[in-house]
């Protein structure tokens, strides 16, 4: 059994605890000073505590906001035989490494870790097979150079919010057309899920898949013409760019 301490049980840390908690091979200690945060993951961790000194496991996940990294690290007495997985956006591996004796790997995950559908980017440096296996228990991991972590933060870290926004737009259009809100949400969300699965499993390019759905003079091509003539792709690119810039600023 692999023992893991998760320091910080907010949105991202909580998703990690819940994701790992679904696997019997992980013994998880959830650490957070906030009682409500601890209670939110109590059913998924073998133990919860407010004491950072409890972070004695071989793998420690640091899941706190960027401005809390420094003070939290001061309270963690990690050793050279531990690995620290830092999830803080915009905080460099070197910044963290200078403040701990543990081996450091920088990871940008997303909230889908809770459901085993996470897309994560991890730095080459510090990424052991044990940590890779841990991440893969919650989804997919791409190993990247740290210079690419800011754009990865925008694509897979912030990306779920962009997709949620698009799902809601499709859902709203369905409701305006007469669908029941629950039906519209289910159909929209499952359509995005199915489209993503197709992209991952089909050998065709995204453009080829679009063509496969667009029959001449059909309904899809009519809708695609509207998207092609709009600035939708530019708006998405701008959103990713803005998130990347913010990651560099933090």
Mark where each language-model region is.
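Rossmann-fold NAD(P) dinucleotide-binding segment
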Residues: 47-102
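Residues at the starts of beta-strands that form the adenosine-phosphate
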Residues: 3, 26-27, 83, 103, ...
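Internal alpha-helical scaffold of NAD(P)-dependent oxidoreductase catalytic cores
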Residues: 98-103, 119-151, 163-201
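NAD(P)-dependent Rossmann-like dehydrogenase/reductase catalytic/cofactor-binding core
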Residues: 16, 189-250
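NAD(P)+-binding Rossmann beta1-loop-alpha1 motif at the extreme N-terminus of oxidoreductases
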Residues: 1-50, 59, 99, 117
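A short glycine-threonine-serine/GTX helix/turn-capping micro-motif
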Residues: 153-161, 210
């Amino acid at each position: 059994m692999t023992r893991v301490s998760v320091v910080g049980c907010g949105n991202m840390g909580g998703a990690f605890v819940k994701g790992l908690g679904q696997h019997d091979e992980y013994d998880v200690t959830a650490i957070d000073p906030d009682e409500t945060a601890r209670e939110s993951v109590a059913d998924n961790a073998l133990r919860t505590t407010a004491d950072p000194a409890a972070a004695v496991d071989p793998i420690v996940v640091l899941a706190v906001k960027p401005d809390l990294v420094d003070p939290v690290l001061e309270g963690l007495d990690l050793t050279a035989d531990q690995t620290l997985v830092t999830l803080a956006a915009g905080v460099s591996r070197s910044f963290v490494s200078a403040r701990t004796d543990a081996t450091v790997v920088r990871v940008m995950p997303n909230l889908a870790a809770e459901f085993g559908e996470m897309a994560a980017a991890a730095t080459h440096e510090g990424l052991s097979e044990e940590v890779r296996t841990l991440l893969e228990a919650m989804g997919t991991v791409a190993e990247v150079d740290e210079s690419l972590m800011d754009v990865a933060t925008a694509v897979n870290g912030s990306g779920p919010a962009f997709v949620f926004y698009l799902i809601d737009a499709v859902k709203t259009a369905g409701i305006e057309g007469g669908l029941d809100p629950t039906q519209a949400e289910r159909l929209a969300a499952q359509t995005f899920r199915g489209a993503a699965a197709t992209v991952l499993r089909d050998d065709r390019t995204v453009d080829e898949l679009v063509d496969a759905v667009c029959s001449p003079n059909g309904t899809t091509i009519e809708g695609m013409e509207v998207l092609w003539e709009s600035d939708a792709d530019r708006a998405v690119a701008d959103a990713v760019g803005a998130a990347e810039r913010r990651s560099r600023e933090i």
